[in-house]
């Protein structure tokens, strides 16, 4: 799986079977090779296209999405502005990567979400990334894209990834 950042709230997740793009309140799955129509998800529910599963959960004023492919689970928090409820946090288990908004949610609250979910990777996005990174004791790593698999997940500490 390869994850790259396209600016604002937009990520691109390339898998062996398809390409997932995110944009604030939506997740779109495109078929590998551009064959077939794109499938856009804008509401809570369970979806599967091209071997990619997407689980949408209602959060206050937004929908958050788990994108599951290649034995990895990526949580995309969109533009949530409040801490997810404890009930929702318990549903968001076994997250490998979390993309978290540091503007609408705030750096402190984003850190609290990360602490509750304990992912392997954190992908902060927004204008206040530096403030979030400064509050994280282990620093960050800057990359153009993140290539990962279940076998390459870090063992000891959650890594904060900042995209160029």
What label would you give each PLM region?
Residues 1-27, 33-93, 105-109, 143-164:
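Core dinuclear metal-dependent hydrolase active-site scaffold
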Residues 95-100, 107-127:
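Proline-aspartate-enriched helix->loop->beta-strand connector
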Residues 112-113, 130-142:
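Short, aromatic/basic amphipathic alpha-helical patches
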């Amino acid at each position: 799986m390869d994850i790259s950042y396209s600016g604002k709230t937009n990520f691109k997740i390339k898998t062996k079977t398809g390409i997932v793009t995110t944009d604030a309140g939506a997740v779109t799955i495109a078929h590998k090779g551009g064959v077939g129509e794109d499938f856009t998800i804008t509401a809570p529910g369970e979806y599967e296209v091209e071997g990619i599963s997407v689980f949408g959960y209602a959060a206050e004023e937004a929908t958050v999405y788990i994108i599951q492919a290649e034995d990895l689970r990526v949580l995309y928090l969109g533009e949530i502005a409040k801490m997810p409820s404890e009930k929702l946090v318990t549903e968001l288990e076994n997250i490998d990567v979390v993309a978290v908004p540091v503007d609408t949610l705030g750096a402190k609250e984003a850190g609290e979400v990360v602490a509750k979910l304990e992912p392997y990777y954190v992908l902060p996005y927004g204008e206040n990334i530096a403030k979030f990174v400064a509050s994280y004791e282990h620093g960050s790593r800057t990359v153009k894209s993140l290539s990962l698999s279940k076998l390459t997940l870090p063992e000891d500490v959650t890594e904060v990834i900042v995209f160029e």
